[in-house]
C-alpha cells in the first residue's frame, strides 16, 4: 500500500488489538518510517503510554481529542491510535490524515458490552483500506469470543477497565449469562 491509508483493527476486549497495533507500528519503524502512537488519556489503567493487557508498554501521546495533536504529528508518516472508539473525532481525523498521505492504524472495540456499535468507530469501515476483526477466547467455555461482557451492573458506556471488569465471551455465553 503506497500513500495514505487507514488500517482498522477491531474486536472484543482481550483480543490482542493493542498488541497488533504495536506490531504494525514497529514494522513501519523497522522500515525507517517516522511513527507516533496516540492513546486515550482517560485510560490510565497501567500508567503512561500505550499498554497491552500482558503489560507490554509503548510510548504514546495522550489526549481525549485527536485534533489536539494535529500540530505535534505533522512530521510523522505513520500514526497509531489505540482505543479509537473513545475519540469523538476519530472518523474526521483518520480521513484527514490518510488524505494527507499518512498511514493511520486504529485499534478499537467495535461493540459495547451491550453489543451495540461503539460510538462512531464503525463509520471508519467504509473509509478504511484494511479492516481486521480479531477474536478472543471465551472466558467461560474457551471457544472463539467476539463479544465483551461487563461484569458489573454499571450502565454507562465509557467505563475503562481490563479483565477485572470485562470478559470476552462467545455468543452462547453472552446470551446465557
Swiss-Prot record:
Keywords: ATP-binding, Disulfide bond, DNA synthesis, Kinase, Metal-binding, Nucleotide-binding, Transferase, Zinc. Its EC number is 2.7.1.21. It catalyses: thymidine + ATP = dTMP + ADP + H(+). Substrate binds at residues 113, 157-161. One of its GO terms (biological process) is DNA biosynthetic process. ATP binds at residues 11-18. It comes from the Viruses. GO terms for molecular function: ATP binding; metal ion binding; thymidine kinase activity. The keyword Membrane does not apply. The keyword Zinc-finger does not apply. The active site is at residue 83. Pfam families: TK. Zn(2+) binds at residues 138, 141, 170, 173. It is an enzyme of class 2 (transferase). InterPro entries: P-loop_NTPase, Thymidine_kinase, Thymidine_kinase_CS. PANTHER family: THYMIDINE KINASE (PTHR11441), THYMIDINE KINASE, CYTOSOLIC (PTHR11441:SF0). Belongs to the thymidine kinase family. Homotetramer. Two molecules of substrate bind to each enzyme tetramer. Phosphorylates thymidine and thymidine analogs, such as azidothymidine (AZT). Part of the salvage pathway for pyrimidine deoxyribonucleotide synthesis. This is Thymidine kinase. It comes from Monkeypox virus (strain Zaire-96-I-16).
Amino acid at each position: 500500500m503506497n500513500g495514505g491509508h487507514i488500517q482498522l483493527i477491531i474486536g472484543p476486549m482481550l483480543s490482542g488489538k493493542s498488541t497488533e497495533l504495536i506490531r504494525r507500528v514497529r514494522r513501519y519503524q523497522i522500515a525507517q518510517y517516522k511513527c507516533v502512537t496516540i492513546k486515550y488519556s482517560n485510560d490510565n489503567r497501567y500508567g503512561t503510554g500505550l499498554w497491552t493487557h500482558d503489560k507490554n508498554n509503548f510510548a504514546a501521546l495522550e489526549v481525549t481529542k485527536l485534533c489536539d495533536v494535529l500540530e505535534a504529528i505533522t512530521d510523522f508518516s505513520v500514526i497509531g491510535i489505540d482505543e479509537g472508539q473513545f475519540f469523538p473525532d476519530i472518523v474526521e481525523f483518520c480521513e484527514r490524515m490518510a488524505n494527507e498521505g499518512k498511514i493511520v492504524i486504529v485499534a478499537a472495540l467495535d461493540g459495547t458490552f451491550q453489543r451495540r456499535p461503539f460510538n462512531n468507530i464503525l463509520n471508519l469501515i467504509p473509509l478504511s483500506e484494511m479492516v481486521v476483526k480479531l477474536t478472543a477466547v471465551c472466558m467461560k467455555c474457551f471457544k472463539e469470543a467476539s463479544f465483551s461482557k461487563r461484569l458489573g451492573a454499571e450502565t454507562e458506556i465509557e467505563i475503562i477497565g481490563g479483565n477485572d471488569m470485562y470478559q470476552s465471551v462467545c455468543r452462547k455465553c453472552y446470551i446465557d449469562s
